[in-house]
Amino acid sequence: MRAAGIGGICHQRKRGRHRPAPAPHEDLVRRRFVAEEPNRLWCTDITQHPTSEGRVYCAAVLDVFSRQVVGWSIADHIRAELVVDALQMATWRRRPEPGAIVHADRGPQYTSWVFGHRLREAGLLGSMGRAASSVDNTMIESFWSTMQRELLDQQHWTSKAELATAIFEWIEAWYNPPRRHTSLGNLSPTEFENLHTAATAAA
């Protein structure tokens, strides 16, 4: 999938028998998913879904301000580079200012040295909820539920490449640009951010 230019999926939760590692970051969010502007608070997580060829995994980074997916990665593995690739896409696209918060769970990918290193390189602050607590990352859990309902459960997926392409198209061509959210005043994430940008420029 990397050769095809498609980089890291999971609503059937990734948690298995592994005991969660001690959190290297405190919980800076405490279930208060509120941001006054873009690129101040991101949340990130992994989901997975089966195909006839095996599982596909997706990591996503969601901007709390607009619910826009600012970074994602799709792969056939769940190693730490899956979440690092999603973070790198987000930082490359958005260029967040130092001190922006990235909130995750305590999965081994997010407690890994390499993920923490990438956060420090970008000047970002890591934040982690409690182990095995979906309510501590509820916004991105809601995003996965939407993807599950609108895309993943709509058909049987024959190949990993087929599903990876469908996820890419769902995020970039549907979820971000036109899909409307009642929580955003019936605007899409892209429309909501554009409105904020225009209002800020006019102020």
Residue positions per predicted region:
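Charged DNA-binding/catalytic regions of mobile-element recombinases
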Residues: M1-A203
